[in-house]
Amino acid sequence: MLVASLTLPVKTFAEFIAYAKANPGKLNFASAGVGTAPHLAAELFLSVAQLNLTHVPYNGSSAQAIRALIAGDVAMFMVGTSTALPFIKNGNVRALAVTSTISRVDGLPDVPTFAEAGLPQVDYSLWFAIAVPSATPTDIVKKLNADINKIVADPQYQDALKIRGFEAKGSTSDELAAFMEKDYLKNRALILKLRLHVD
């Protein structure tokens, strides 16, 4: 999710784009460190939108980056919805767009997706999975997978996650492996394109 500092004279995604284009190299953006998901998501957005902002990494800490955004030390931050939601709801930061190309966030119905805002290429999501050691017997893996998918499909569980900005999807082990490979290749290509190096 793209969130902006309230110190900027913008209220919408389009206004942010126009302001950033009118001030090339004068704005900056926060991340939780070089190569982190917020950094890669921001670089993808800036590349697609053809914007020039300076990266300010806060080593491994979204909390530091959010504080800098609230203070006006940085102009924008690409952050997970669940992290940003309380600060948006409290009026500390401004939500401009959601990185999902699928749907808006239930708790923020007025915030467009990047696709709706005209940049469908900005498709970057944080995700979580449950894994077991590779030596785990197949029958145990199948049992765990079935039980977890049952929980994930429960409407009450789905609703509890949606309120917090999450979307839960079940899968098979093979589907998860294929998804992880695709995500790895996407991130690898972005890292190589940007010539990122982790210190």
Mark where each language-model region is.
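Short beta-strand and adjacent tight-turn residues that come in two discontinuous sequence segments
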Residues: 58, 78-79, 98, 124
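C-terminal lobe and pocket-closing loops
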Residues: 84-152, 185
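An extracytoplasmic/periplasmic, membrane-proximal ligand-sensing/linker region
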Residues: 51, 89, 138-199
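Short helices/loops that flank or line small-molecule/ion binding pockets
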Residues: 44, 48, 63-77, 82-90, ...
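Alpha-to-beta junction loops
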Residues: 23-27, 51, 70-79, 92-95, ...
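Hinge/capping helix and adjacent helix->loop/strand transition within the periplasmic-binding protein
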Residues: 1-64, 111-114, 127-160
